[in-house]
């Protein structure tokens, strides 16, 4: 039962029950204590946002209300940085608010428009069979997200841009939460570092590990905000209940 060694006792108990293991919550807590295990704690956010005053900013269409009634109604996007032996690696994510699924991501050595644009393009490809008309894509006011290339691509896929403020985590809270989970569960996770054979060497090994973590995050990691289901399970349940919304 792989979980990157990040689950606390409640989530590990839930995961055990999902796996058919008949263990009580107190029993799980005792076993964790006996083995010296504890859940991962998230690190404090450090801001990487740099606004460009020359760029035209879209309005904030979200207003900190990160709620959606279906997949592909609202995406949030952001990027974070990771230290490695060979320098900083930046990782960008695009997250579907309804299911918390990471629909697009990209790792690169510089925080350019290409970084966030590639993550957006992956998201569009991931949802290539879905109708994206009516989609809102919310970001902070970083220059990468207000660039002409990025906003033009949003227009091409039928998404409306929404921009929060600079260096305010509440204005892009769900994206910030995903960044924090990534840093805690992969980049700074002792279990992940051990599996890597030591500290991250650079873009290549971190990129491969990120690919594995994103797959686990989407299909195996249970989320308390999703009633202890995975993003894939939440989307599958939606499409079973709304078969007509799926593209032919």
Segments and roles (model prediction):
Residues 1-248:
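Charged DNA-binding/catalytic regions of mobile-element recombinases
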